[in-house]
């Protein structure tokens, strides 16, 4: 929070209120009279200053009473009766007065002078001006002076125990800070009222947990007239590249448009089988598979400075993904397919099919269009290689279109179904794709990748590109690519867990699920349909109404 501009040369002083009956006041030698003396001292010691009182959040919410009423205050005193970030407020102050409030220590961390009228844990170490009658005795008991770092380490790291917000296990302060920082950042990105437009019941059910807006409503349609009457701070959420006209009109009005898509480590099953996503990309600038404009991901890859710690995180994540065989859908048997004798001594090329009406194929593969064309282009360029074709899991499941024509099947030396992507990648020397995420997963495993379209990972010097990408001029290492694409870009959530988690949390959850499923049989068609019906029924109950 930012206070009104101060008069040049006029200092600002903060007096921190607390709630009546607070145990820290009782144990810290403070009373209601303490707060009267505190405000009097602030006024007397700073006759030319602005005096501000910070009201406690429990007082603002009506749950507790404080020690200051507006009508009792001197005309020089201003009551700050609204929520604010303590550190942002303290940064604007020149002196801070407290009884026993923790804000006194936070002021010390910012290098502010602090006067203590009570006996908080951070008093008596030579860092505060202590005016309590027992202050001298307290300092004698402390026995030595300490600096702010000493106090921070003792109180925040050595003394306090932490629980990981995601796993519920013992954790470090750094785990908790990472979680808090992530959730604060996402919360600040999307506080405006949000309309989810044109989404199915299931899609709304999966999307809403990934939005941080205080108010989320669903609309079947949003007419130009209604769009023109929406407040300027409204956010529009769209799935993928649908409703292009609405997206253009909303952005022309200056509204925020969030285009949402599956993340790159999605789930333990297919989206078309109604497995809820564990990650989604929420992009205010476009979609990562459409090269016509620079998505937030492309901008991050182009400009984000990746320091050695970031790259190290990318390397560790890459190694964990490969070691546990984690990919987008985590399907199929991990048994490595057998190559016939005819393949021995030949270069092994894995061609990855896609769902042919998928938006990434429509937008990002305008030169080679469709699985038949991809297989033909690969065979034409590699007549002597052993070519293996693997279709998309959604196509294999019968949920989406993209089967090869019989005339194209003869171009492949081997067609593999059932086996997991990771198992197939073990065999390959090269992987050829249009825009498939499988190309990215092949890069993680050290494979040579040929791209005939414009996936997010092409154009950075890591792939052989058959599609022009002149906007992407930066050269990246694989670990830099992994850090930006997996650690920074998507949002992650786990079932039944509050808040947004890290990609590492999701990978660990998937690895545990995968180990638990070892030896389990595949679901029958009937079981899949029953589970899908259950997911859909819950979606209707939770999100079944348009406004």
Language-model features, listed with the residues they occupy:
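Leloir-type glycosyltransferase catalytic cores
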Residues: 1-9, 26, 128-198, 202, ...
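Segments forming glycine/polar-rich beta-alpha architectures that bind adenosine-containing cofactors
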Residues: 1-3, 7, 30-31, 208-275, ...
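Short loop/turn segments at strand-loop or loop-helix junctions that form parts
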Residues: 10-22, 55-56, 119, 261-262, ...
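Histidine-anchored nucleotide/phosphate-binding helix
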Residues: 15, 28-45, 208-211, 245, ...
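N-terminal pre-catalytic "stem/leader" segment of glycosyltransferase-like enzymes
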Residues: 21-22, 173-233, 240-247, 357-358
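Catalytic donor nucleotide-activated moiety binding site of glycosyltransferases and closely related
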Residues: 39-81, 375-417
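Short acidic-hydrophobic, aromatic-tinged amphipathic segments that line or gate anion-handling sites
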Residues: 77-83, 135, 218-222, 413-418, ...
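A donor-sugar binding/catalytic signature common to diverse glycosyltransferases
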Residues: 83-128, 238-248, 256, 261, ...
